[in-house]
């Protein structure tokens, strides 16, 4: 695999992690700390191919969760995690929630103290972090494609009305920044359980997004969704 493709996959993976990833710290019988990075995606041949590329570049292993129709990519080896999270030094996580998870994991790696973990785990989302300015993110395009793979939908209604949707929990400021970035005219929709959504119907904006994904391709099953969306 060429260097350019490897770097693309790293940036794309960061977007996936921001969208549907989890950075976890747990304990084993109150004695030892356990660490895990995980991505869960729908079980499809396209998503399997995408995760195999991620495995080739970043490491980890894949598990099929047939009862939930999911494929999980995960790393739970402490030494491997310490190596993999160095990627976030080059390509920072963007969502506040994932950055809080990463900060909590790093602090536990440093302390290796079950008592500290037990006392602080309820506070891991309470630290105030500055909202990322997406205009300053040099890898935004690749990150955005990964984020859309995780959170985006290409929708076609019965009347053949087409629209694009991003839905994400917790990080309302990020979605507001995306509205500004793409000059989206529709308002942010607030739903249950701190879920927020952007819907784009305007043809010129949909064309901008299609052009983006032609240059920065989707790697999983959203690629097929996009092709169907384009031809209807």
Curated annotation (Swiss-Prot):
Record bears the keyword Cell division: no
Subcellular location(s) per record: Mitochondrion
Record InterPro entries: Homing_endonucl (IPR027434), LAGLIDADG_dom (IPR004860), LAGLIDADG_Endonuclease (IPR051289)
GO cellular component: mitochondrion
Pfam family, any one: LAGLIDADG_1
Keyword list, A-Z: Endonuclease, Hydrolase, Intron homing, Mitochondrion, Nuclease
Chain ranges passing through the membrane: none
Family: Belongs to the LAGLIDADG endonuclease family.
Protein known as: Probable intron-encoded endonuclease aI3
Organism: Dictyostelium discoideum (Social amoeba)
Organism phylogeny: Eukaryota, Amoebozoa, Evosea, Eumycetozoa, Dictyostelia
Gene behind the chain: aI3
